[in-house]
């Protein structure tokens, strides 16, 4: 029967019995993709509205004869070593089709055959050299393969792979079917990590000694193919070298042996003066990371399809060649003053540039391409350098200030980021290309941390507080003292002095810190950075200085003159102050005070460079401000029913605040609006609402409150803890 044109519900009278209809599916679908079966009933009536009555039975649809073929699996491992010279490890694994745990259903068992092995070996090649050389050469080699053969053909998922192979007419067909069905992965790696010369104890290590260096090398290779990917190759080359040396110089103390300072405690700080001429440590590292990836998707083989008529799929290649280096210098100028400098540069080796120079074929897919131009350091893509200075103020050497501990820290950061290659092709209306425009940014952080340990101060002054005595014992002691002192004339004076000492030693600890962060971002910067970093645009800028460099950079020709350049110059400033204090009047009673103030301001500005002159355009300033305050005066104000008296004050204060704000402004004398508020300062104006809220909830007079929310001094919050009630 011709099935090219099948009419739905076609009547087939030749079918035996009561089967009058035949349903068919056009094409060759895979039964493995069936998720749902639908059964329908056809209405045989040809007249609408006919009364119908029928009974339909659907027997249970069940799959019978499930193949519950069992499988097996095995795992093997072999470990060996040759003393401490070499180690060897090999593992193998096999599992057949149908393998699974005893509680798995037939459908949950594996539908593939797995064969896998891995071999790993480590050899300390340095032991082959004389021991006095002190060579450390750890060689590692690893290889492995994984072969996964499915039970069913990946394309015809309802046909077993073995059956399809048996029906193939030629050996070449069987090879093509088998090759596209098997999931195959091969791995190989060779590495030399931490090659170095250890100290043999023969002499003092110098900054140029070979013991300060170590070298690393690693090569990784992976080959993979499966049903979708005809071939995927990934080659990875890693090389690196590190240098590190710590100078062992003693600090110079010019006044340490001056004996006259020993008898004068206020001059003893001179004995502690010290400085170092040599840095503390010097570090550097270089890393090469090259990745080459070749991939080609598979053109699936099908019987009856001429492969020569199919459009070939392209080879995809991805290369990522990186060259990174960094260095660090640490110098303890003295025991209290420490200096650190770090710089890191990441470079990209451009493939196009190498092809133009004849170094590499840009379409070369062989792994030997990893070694082409190995000495090429590429073009800088990102440069970061950090400068930090830490100073511990010498209060501990001053007798009357020894209870103060203070530290100042300064950190300056500089970053150079290369511009986008894609955006460099943008052309203005006048035909001027944008080119490579870089971005520079810097910031600095200043932090001053201070702690006051009043227990040291009280001890130095000879004051001893009774606040550590439990409350009930103090009561008993006070009664005993009163009984004994009542017999003396100076009893009241002694009791008063005791109370005075307790009052003077209430404060146990005070801490305060202030930090400030400033930064700027300048886009459109044209110069690159040198191999060892950069000192442009100025030395101060690279160390975090916020001196304005925009006009000087434009005058020097360092900023792009592209007429359609629209990236913004930005500046940021933030400051944070925190303070805390702890009072302990008696044991079990602790009062903590905390105050803080935060301020942040950002400024964005568009600009244009005309004739090497910086021309600022529109700018935008925004920020945040927060400060602790005390609301104790209004926290317990009574409420009138569902109305809050503080909120009512807030509403009524708005007119008074608005009348004060309009003074000495262009809106003064312009009258009032329909609600009685001055023009420009309505009842919902931001400044009116903010100052009215502060006056209402802090309990201040709206006619006297400062009309600026950014006040200088924060008011502390407090927390009261009572833990000594059980001692009463």
Where are these regions (language model features)?
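Exposed, low-structure sequence patches enriched in small/polar residues
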Residues: 46-728
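Extracellular beta-strand ligand-recognition surfaces/modules
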Residues: 1-51
